[in-house]
Amino acid sequence: MLTQPSIKYRPAQIIDFPARTWPSKQLKTPPRWCSTDLRDGNQALANPMDHVKKMAFFKHLIECGFKEIEVAFPAASQTDFDFVRLLIEGKHIPDDVTIQVMTQSRVDLIERTIQSLVGAKKAIVHIYNATAPVFREIVFCQDKPATLELAVQGVKHIRQLCEQYPDTQWTLQYSPETFCFTEPDFALEVCEAAAKTWQPSLERPMILNLPTTVEVNTPNVFADQIEHFITSFSSLENITISVHPHNDRGTGVATAEMAILAGAQRVEGCLFGNGERTGNVDLVTLAMNLYSQGVYPNLDFSDMRRTVELVEECNELPVHPRHPYAGALAFTAFSGSHQDAIKKGFASQKSTSSMIWQIPYLPLDPKDIGCTYEEVIRVNSQSGKSGAAWLLQENHGLFLPRKLQIDFSKKVKNHTDQTGHEMPLADVWRLFRESYRLNPDDKGQMKLMDYRSHSSNGLQEIRATLRYQEKTWQLVGEGKGLLSAMLDALRKRFNWQINISDFHEHTLGQQTKSKAVSYVQIESDQATPSFGVAIDEDSTKASLQALINACHPLYKEA
């Protein structure tokens, strides 16, 4: 890299537009959406889609709610031409969906394009030519009048051909390619001339599509360009202002959002930002950004995973794990502090009647797009006490007491430090069961076989039968409750100097016949404090077994 890049690169020009109003506005309504996956996205693929993939993609776009879909560049290849004919002749286009095709401003290409659309109920013909100085002077060797005339003659020819097919509802879309670095006055002049030639009406509307063909400036500058264009245009009756942002500077989404604030009514782009170079604007992120602000985008990504899988299969490109909303890690927290905040957020959400989503680190509810909460918190060496506790709570209904959370997190961290890898839910559950003797079929575990109790002189007396490996013991104890009576019995039988330092219990589920889970921590002169957990349909038996399980480190003394 150059230490003085200014000797090679010049900053893009900005426009002086103090009358801007867009910065104080909010996004309250969705734009019209146009997917260009089958044209702009497809032309950027190393292996362009065949008809089977294109049809699957087309149908999925319709399922997601797209009403305008750019399907081909018919004059570019026989494959594209045939696909348009397949859609029309096969009656694959719903009545409320309009297909769009693209053409350059050349007579032969325009004629081929219109031929591909014969029989369509509705169609958008998208014509473009480059208008920026670097393209006029270097690529096409044209001056401004020649560039303007190319646009006018192309629109004129399209109009003449469309008039031959009155059964189709025609819409013209004109794009001054490279609009974002075209002189504002010249871009306005060319678009005015195109509109004057087309003469838009209610029956024959027009779209002016203003692209950031290559991103060269910050999103606020493009927003100024859009608002300046809109306020300067002579008449926008029956004309829709559309934008087509690219992502060369990584700000395609912000560019589109600010353009909408500035007055754009329509956005073209691709799912997950496919397209030439760094791609087009990502329509999924745009739509979900609106959704997370309480605005229904008129697109449905309720099954985000299915959308990801289809796009990956058709494009032969992966969706990045960190991709907003759609990536495999989009909602995942490994950090202990993040996990703790999320866990507390869910607990707060459950304790209130408010439907407003307020969960730290999660801009929307993953379930709204078909994800599970299992994907939210995952456990590795960076995780704290809340991560594993959350997984056990959400997947097994266990609400671990704080002391047990801390104890188990140490065991988890020791495991992940040793392996150096993420610890999946199945391994977390296995480690928990092994650590706190939640394995009723384990022969190395002391089990409560049966017990009887009765009250005498204000005390509870318990008679219990325990089995450990091949040994069986009969125990007798008394206390103010059955748990303290069992504690007394264990002390007497095994001479253990133990005390219960923590005890919690709750039901698993909301049903009357739900099982109970008990958590017991003991302290002993003979061993470090330890925990036991037990689950049983009998809540009393669960608490007694949990106490017995907590004594596991002392079994060698028995």
Swiss-Prot record:
Q: Which PROSITE patterns match?
A: AIPM_HOMOCIT_SYNTH_1, AIPM_HOMOCIT_SYNTH_2, PYR_CT
> How far does the signal peptide extend, from start to end residue?
none
Per the record, the pathway is: Amino-acid biosynthesis; L-leucine biosynthesis; L-leucine from 3-methyl-2-oxobutanoate: step 1/4
At which positions is Mg(2+) bound?
D40, H244, H246, N280
User: Which Gene3D superfamilies does UniProt cross-reference here?
Assistant: 3.30.160.270, Aldolase class I
**Top enzyme class:** transferase
Q: How does it assemble?
A: Homodimer.
Know the name of this protein?
2-isopropylmalate synthase
Where the record annotates domain Pyruvate carboxyltransferase, the positions are 31-305
* Keywords, alphabetical: Amino-acid biosynthesis, Branched-chain amino acid biosynthesis, Cytoplasm, Leucine biosynthesis, Magnesium, Metal-binding, Transferase
* Known cofactor(s): Mg(2+)
Q: What does this protein do?
A: Catalyzes the condensation of the acetyl group of acetyl-CoA with 3-methyl-2-oxobutanoate (2-ketoisovalerate) to form 3-carboxy-3-hydroxy-4-methylpentanoate (2-isopropylmalate).
Which InterPro entries does the entry mention? 2-isopropylmalate_synth_dimer (IPR013709), AIPM/Hcit_synth_CS (IPR002034), Aldolase_TIM (IPR013785), IPM_Synthase (IPR005668), LeuA-like_post-cat (IPR054692), LeuA_allosteric_dom_sf (IPR036230), LeuA_N_DRE-TIM (IPR039371), PYR_CT (IPR000891)
Q: What catalytic activity is recorded? A: 3-methyl-2-oxobutanoate + acetyl-CoA + H2O = (2S)-2-isopropylmalate + CoA + H(+)
Q: Which family does it belong to?
A: Belongs to the alpha-IPM synthase/homocitrate synthase family. LeuA type 2 subfamily.
Annotated localization:
Cytoplasm
GO CC term, one of those recorded: cytoplasm
